[in-house]
């Protein structure tokens, strides 16, 4: 088998190995839903903007007016998230009873991890600052996923979704 045999074997091996990544990528892509998060910039931006607005409204409130906070977010959330948010706000109310404290949340980074024609999953990172009279502001970070669905008026929080705190409890 001289040099000529080695060259043919090398070419065949190169073709087989060169096609392997395409086969693996093709098989993986076949299992994935039609994710347009990195392709459809306009829809990605709309879903991301809506998720940021919902998140900042949910997590910015004052202890002086928690009933108003509940009313304000009533139109933003549905389904399981209504129950989960009521529990979170109830815990907050217990923790700040008799205190004057305001929480302001700002989404610092976000990204759409899934986008198809009817659904978007948005990963959000936020900083929440608390201010009390006579004290320096304090900050903490959080991250979670918010699922949105496409409705007649645009992107809205999905009925069956809750805030996925990514394992943080």
What are the functions of these language-model segments?
Residues 133-139:
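Solvent-exposed, non-transmembrane alpha-helical starts
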